[in-house]
Amino acid sequence: SEMCIRDSYYADLRPVIGSEQGGIRPVLILQNNVGNRHSPTVIAAPITSKMGKPRLPTHVCLNRQANGLSCGSVILLEQLRTIDKSRLRERVGALDTSEMKQIDWALGVSVGLAEGYR
């Protein structure tokens, strides 16, 4: 099926420089669906299961097992990346509307659109 905003995929983020999240890990697709359909690249945020709890306002913790992502996984919206679609592997699942509301707010914080976070 077609890739959509709010889907998660495994992606190969190697090679890594410095503090970037790396390896083969899940990422959340954040690019709009027109871009997902036509662009050779995609905007994504890495997901980690090793953090335990969110540490920054740009972190969103999944409070349930979300279609293949483990409960307690944290989406790192301060580490947005534009990656080539060839880095994507299999689809993991999709987030629901309430989770996407949290994502939207944290994304606003990350890019300076949220009130008080410029």
What are these regions (language model features)?
Residues 6-118:
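Conserved functional hotspots at enzyme active or ligand-binding sites that engage polyanionic ligands
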Residues 1-5:
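Short, small-residue-biased leader/transition segments that mark boundaries at the very start
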